Amino acid sequence: MFFLSLIIRNITVVNASGRDEQMDVWMKDGKIAQIAQHIHAQGVDQLEGSGKFLLPGFIDMHIHGSAQMDTMDASDEGLHIHGPITIKEGTTSFLATTMTQSFDWFDRAQRQCGNNFSPKSDEAEVLGLHIEGPFVSKQRAGAQPLDYIVQPDMEVIKKWQALSGQKIKQITLAPEEPNGMAAVQSLSESGVIVSIGHSDATFEQMQEAVQLGASQGTHLYNQMRPFHHRDPGVVGGVLLVDAIKAELIVDFIHMHEGAVEMAYRLKGADGIILITDAMRAKGMPYGEYDLGGQLVHVTESGAHLSNGSLAGSILTMDQAVRNMRQITNCTLEELVKMSSYNAAQQLKLTNKGQLTEGYDADAVIVDEHLLLHQTIKAGRIRVQTNN
């Protein structure tokens, strides 16, 4: 079902700031036109929402691929294969994420992504690029190919920004590397989100990076200097510094439930951003897949390189939301913060992350068990599930 104008009746509208029950929501021309009780309108398609909840569409700030597609493929159809898969899990917007590779490969990916940002009618929207690698630590490389890891270089970043049409919104880097702190400051001043990740920084180096503008931690706990009582490391810095938002991959593989609970208690919902870090095997059968020229084995235990290193995930955003609720018993309002609102704030979006009149009509309808029933993008029902 595809609507140009839609009213959802008698639904509970949930935002980060609270909820309103038994509301009608009128979506028109891609925007939220009105939220009120008993909206009267003629010639408008209607959807009954009794007993269900309307949440802002999920925003995934860290996703490499799905359905055999990867951002680094630099193909014409790549993002247009990816978009229809992510929207099925309630993700209405995302950052296409890269990984460490040769500069030539990066050049192609930046150029191709910059040319393919207009979504088709059944796709999630690409908000921009998240550059993960090559400016990371070889000591914390994980699945990032060692041969292509280099020191942060602002001239290279400026070239990529130009090739992408100024679409780079976030960069993961290791600030302790040579030129790292200068890059943190320069990027932050230019409006790019600096996320500390794949980093062996000390706690003190972490604090310095935050003072220079770093505001996020890439997939907390994974491939970062761990906590020690004499050196809290990057993990300690992400957990303790309020100015840092923590990305979490809540798939029961990348971290223990207790580690998720600890992050929730220390950061609170205001300090957490749920991500998938998904790779091309998402939405595909178990088997062998490629990640940056490396063989990845995908099983029920996750995605791993031959050496055992985790290589992204096959997590979906709706499952991440359910997992977070299961572990922490957090409220729906808190889930909105962690799945959309915080990401929108980080990206300085003034049209997403909230269900408010004038905002984009991007939303999901879920039941009391957080099972997805509909995904709405630009006021149209793009996905209707059998839940």
From Swiss-Prot:
Pathway stated in the Swiss-Prot or TrEMBL entry: Amino-sugar metabolism; N-acetylneuraminate degradation; D-fructose 6-phosphate from N-acetylneuraminate: step 4/5
Necessary cofactors: a divalent metal cation
Principal EC category: hydrolase
Biological role stated in the UniProt entry: Involved in the first committed step in the biosynthesis of amino-sugar-nucleotides. Catalyzes the hydrolysis of the N-acetyl group of N-acetylglucosamine-6-phosphate (GlcNAc-6-P) to yield glucosamine 6-phosphate and acetate.
Gene3D superfamilies referenced in this protein's UniProt entry, alphabetically: Metal-dependent hydrolases, Urease, subunit C, domain 1
Subunit structure: Homodimer.
Active site: 277 (proton donor/acceptor)
Alphabetical keyword list: Carbohydrate metabolism, Hydrolase, Metal-binding
Catalytic activity as recorded in UniProt: N-acetyl-D-glucosamine 6-phosphate + H2O = D-glucosamine 6-phosphate + acetate
Cited InterPro entries: Amidohydro-rel, GlcNAc_6-P_deAcase, Metal-dep_hydrolase_composite, Metal_Hydrolase
Annotated residues for binding of a divalent metal cation 2: 132, 198, 219
Protein name, as recorded: N-acetylglucosamine-6-phosphate deacetylase
